[in-house]
Amino acid sequence: IANAAIDYERAHAGRFVMGYEEAIGFSVGPLVRDKDGVSAAVIFAELAAWNRARGRSVLDHLDDVYRRVGLFVTEQVSLTRPGSDGLAQIRDAMTRFRAAPPAALAGHAVETVVDLARGTGGLPPSDVLVFKLAGGRRVIMRPSGTEPKLKNYYEVRIEVAPGEPLADARARGQAELAALRDAHQQLLA
């Protein structure tokens, strides 16, 4: 993350704000070029102190964020396919989804397919497919770089209705996520 931030700042005369990787690495700001949580922990401690001074908890703050921007429900599912046959199956799945992406998943139209194999936004090419569905849902597919696995990431954004308990919104999100995951997994079978 830090190297990409430095390269971006040099190439675009921009300012690095935050970076994130799927393996839960965060880097916040340019002062500490660390992706393993040191700078993020400091920012989190500052957030906790700010909320405590107002008689609130970090969870209260998070609830406010959910109500303002929506509740995000995510899941990662890895399909392990050992051996050379397994690697061929993973390559075949990526090729098949590139050539004929689904028009819809779980009743939600696939609005955009982003194929990162060509590189995008100044990033180098990567064997990743991103399916952007109606309503802010996403499915991301990529082979593992170190194991015989096809990694699949599922994301659903749920609007929280005024006065709706967050537990109810979360349950709706989990149900939508399960339907999205199951529909995609059936296409991989």
Spans of features found by a protein language model:
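Phosphate-binding and adjacent anionic-ligand microenvironments
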Residues: 1-142, 151-153, 160-189
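A generic beta-sheet turn/junction motif
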Residues: 145-147
